[in-house]
Amino acid sequence: MIKLAILLLFTVAIVRCQGPFGPGCEEAGCPEGSACNIITDRCTCSGVRCRMHCPHGFQRSRYGCEFCKCRLEPMKATCDISECPEGMMCSRLTNKCDCKIDINCRKTCPNGLKRDKLGCEYCECRPKRKLIPRLS
């Protein structure tokens, strides 16, 4: 019975996909309006289901996902790739420089991937964390 309950909780946690935005969404989940891409393990925006006609398009959440509310002004032009540091790309989703995703990395890392000085993940596993005992 306990094994069945654990399996059920594990399955629901993966399917629900609700929680903080960012890499590792299979474990952490995704914010409302987005879904977990199991190939890249990153949250992606769900399509907007809205019958409103908005001349300037829909507003976006802080994560860059559109929701059913009209923009009052036209959207700013996207950033230019030349504005982004090396190793980053211009995201049409957020209009900001964002980390490139290495879709060829097939490593399964229990402690996650290492990050470079810009905070972008690269295809190398983080070492196991050393636990330091607390002094009471």
UniProtKB/Swiss-Prot annotation:
Localization per record: Secreted
Key words, A-Z: Disulfide bond, Heparin-binding, Protease inhibitor, Pyrrolidone carboxylic acid, Repeat, Secreted, Serine protease inhibitor, Signal
SUPFAM superfamilies xrefs: Leech antihemostatic proteins
Disulfide partners: C25-C36, C30-C43, C45-C65, C50-C68, C54-C70, C79-C90, C84-C97, C99-C120, C105-C123, C109-C125
Site (Reactive bond): R51, M52, R106, K107
GO biological process assignments: negative regulation of coagulation
Job description of the protein: This highly disulfide-bonded protein is a potent inhibitor of factor Xa. May have therapeutic utility as an anticoagulant. Also exhibits a strong metastatic activity.
Protein name: Antistasin
Source species: Haementeria officinalis
